[in-house]
A protein has these predicted regions:
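Helical catalytic core of nucleic-acid polymerases
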Residues: 87-163, 173-183, 220, 226-355
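Short glycine-rich phosphate-binding loop at a beta-alpha junction
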Residues: 74-88, 250, 308-309, 391, ...
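Acidic, glycine-rich two-metal-ion catalytic cores of nucleic acid-processing enzymes
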Residues: 2-4, 16-18, 24-60, 189-288, ...
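Polymerase palm active-site segment centered on the conserved acidic dipeptide of motif C
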Residues: 189-192, 403-440
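Catalytic palm subdomain of template-directed nucleic-acid polymerases
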Residues: 143, 178-189, 306-307, 397-412
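A glycine-rich phosphate-binding loop feature that marks nucleotide/adenosyl-phosphate handling sites
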Residues: 86-89, 169-173, 199, 207, ...
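Conserved DEDDh/DEDDy metal-dependent 3′-5′ exonuclease domain
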Residues: 2-13, 17-159, 253
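Short, charged, amphipathic alpha-helical segments
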Residues: 167-170, 189
């Protein structure tokens, strides 16, 4: 079970050729972000039932096989337990993500905590301050955990079809979010969770296998997706560059414009709330109170259901028709597919689904899939610059920008995000809590 010498390891590598393989990397410290972590050991399982655990850095084998890690990282066409983590360890991109396949197959997130053994929890509680604790947890306990993972994952691996949609998702999402996480976020000493700071930075962690597909973003109890603008949470975030700034780009009325795109409706590039307010109140100029009321009405109608009195407004008439057709397809086929990635949303997984909830799920999936495609373009553009994309939150992106690149890079990024149909608002600040509007 446990590989002890290089000759045996060489045999394993030869044996894995042309076989379906499951690989589970076990990080050295469950408290550390993968970006700043190491691999304690690696579990291998092949299609004919051969399994091995290979210590990389572990107390049971002082020498370990750390010098052989590159051979594992270069493997292709294997199934890896968590591809995003694997990429952050330096792994090859040409592998299949087990967690994404689980999500595609069962329409539910992969519950990683379910697989840890009682021994893992015992060591973690007993030695809370010991770094790289998984290098102390007995190898046989790591093996037991991996066998449990294999028990549930392997039947899926050998029976699931790797669809075009899955392959597309597998090639995009782990890599994109691994890159964003790897950029880190610079913080000042005022950041309250000191144990999350490494060399002046903290690292976000995106979880994109959610019910709707909209990523959550939290690590060790800190929610990066819900940093309050008013309570001081954002005060500690600053630029890493000596002469740099944080730039936030927000999609204006993002969901409304995405819906318009779905139904083929042309909205003005000016304020959509002003546009709809004119139709709600029958007047050209709105007071501030009427403008706010217009926003409330629009969001209530789109997320809570469209009242009959508003069906005469062309936009809402078309939206209502689209929602009804989507619901009819769901009821008839038992499945609908997300707009961009064509990921299946099955009725068997959501027995309590309603018409409006289905539309909201569908819209959040569209929001994420569309944003991800734009972020891919942004990342390709930023490869030639020092500017970093450091945070993605639903309808906004946060960048860390050196002043020498600001004008050139930001105009390019804004043009990519807007794409001629999605107006973007920009803010700049030295710290994340104090951002001011700018024009580009």
């Amino acid at each position: 079970m446990i590989v002890d010498d290089k000759e045996e390891l060489d045999v394993i590598f030869d044996y894995m050729k042309d076989k379906t393989v499951l690989l589970v990397p076990i990080l050295s410290d469950h408290k550390l972000h993968p970006i700043i972590n190491n691999i304690s050991c690696i579990y291998i399982y092949t299609e004919d039932g051969v399994e091995r655990i290979i210590p990389m850095q572990h107390t049971e084998q002082i020498r370990g096989f750390k010098d052989q890690l590159a051979r594992f990282l270069n493997l292709e066409s294997i199934f890896v337990h968590d591809k995003k983590v694997w990429l952050q360890m330096g792994g090859n991109d040409a592998v299949y993500d087990v967690k994404s396949l689980w999500w595609y197959t069962y329409n539910e997130a992969y519950d990683e905590n379910y697989y840890y053994t009682s021994a893992h929890h015992f060591y973690w509680r007993r030695h809370t301050n010991l770094n790289h604790i998984n290098a102390v947890v007995p190898l046989m306990q790591h093996l037991e955990m991996c066998q449990k993972i294999r028990k549930y994952a392997w039947p899926m691996i050998i029976n699931s079809k790797l669809t075009t949609s899955y392959n597309q998702f597998n090639s995009i999402y782990p890599k994109l979010f691994a890159e964003i996480e790897s950029n880190g976020m610079q913080v000042t000493r005022s950041f309250k969770m000191n144990d999350l700071i490494t060399d002046g930075r903290v690292y976000s962690q995106y979880h994109y296998h959610t019910t709707t597909g909209r990523p959550s973003n939290a690590f060790r109890g800190f929610n990066f997706a819900a940093m309050n603008k008013e309570d001081g949470t954002r005060d500690a975030f600053c630029s890493r560059f000596e002469n740099g700034a944080l730039i936030e780009m927000d999609f204006d009325a993002y969901h409304i414009r995405l819906i318009a795109r779905l139904i083929g409706y042309d909205l003005p590039t000016t304020s959509v709330h002003q546009y709809f307010g004119k139709q709600y109140f029958g007047k050209e100029e709105l007071t501030d109170e009427e403008y706010e009321k217009s926003k409330q009405i629009t969001f209530r109608l789109l997320y809570g259901g469209i009242d009959k009195e508003f069906l005469g407004i062309p936009f809402f008439g078309e939206v209502n028709k689209y929602i009804s057709e989507l619901w009819a397809e769901w009821k008839k086929q038992g499945v609908i597919y997300t707009p961009v990635e064509r990921r299946p949303i099955n009725s068997s997984t959501f027995p309590d689904m309603t018409k409006n909830k289905l539309f909201n799920y569908y819209l959040q999936a569209l929001e994420t899939e569309f944003s991800v495609r734009r972020m891919m373009q942004v990342q390709n553009t930023l490869k030639d610059y020092k500017t970093k994309l450091i945070l993605y939150t639903y309808d906004s992106l946060l960048f860390d920008v050196p002043v020498t690149e600001a004008k050139e890079v930001l105009i390019k990024v804004k043009n990519i995000l807007q794409g001629g149909e999605f107006p973007v608002k920009c803010k700049v600040g030295n710290i994340y809590s104090k951002m001011n509007n700018i024009s580009l």
